[in-house]
Amino acid sequence: MQLSVVFFISRPLLILSLPVNFLRQYIWNHRTKFALNILAHPWLTLITFNGLLTIYLIPAVFNIIHTNIFLSIITQAILFVSAIFMWWVIIHPVPEIKGLDYLLRALYIFLASLALFPIGFYYVIIQSAHFPVYIPVERELIHSLSSIYDQQLAGGILKVMQLASYSFVLLILLFKWGKQEEAKEGSVDEEHIRYARGVVIHLDKEKK
């Protein structure tokens, strides 16, 4: 539950809470632009965040990480940064920075929603306890919730929270996309293209 909230609710809200001028001045400026263009590359962030989170959630890896506080802190920091970059691509908070168009962002969200399906499905069908650290405290909060059921519930919550956050953002993107296309209706751009009822019409320059 905590992990789902951290990566699929608090991260996008953190980006949205920052003023655009702050992002321009301190996050995306001439000193950081080159590095961020690489680190925040859309398809790299898609693979990096979902790949790292999947590896982190593998029981053997998870147990090793949480036996060392410093390793746990480093892992959380890496996941934090990779989640920020992934949500940056989706939200695109600074309009003048070149990013994916609405169609590609919708595709990006669709692929991101599929990326964690294997590990989420694994937790749902799991039939043995894989996290020794949680076994001593099983049934303390809810008596009928064994460590196995707890793992299965965690997998279900992970997918539900992920899909809910992505679906909400996708609806907002589709709404903005529709408003953008509506604003283009009947206009002619610098490439002599007219937009009429969603149809693109190429005009001769002399007929502009």
Model-predicted regions and their roles:
Residues 1-208:
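Alpha-helical membrane segments of multi-pass proteins
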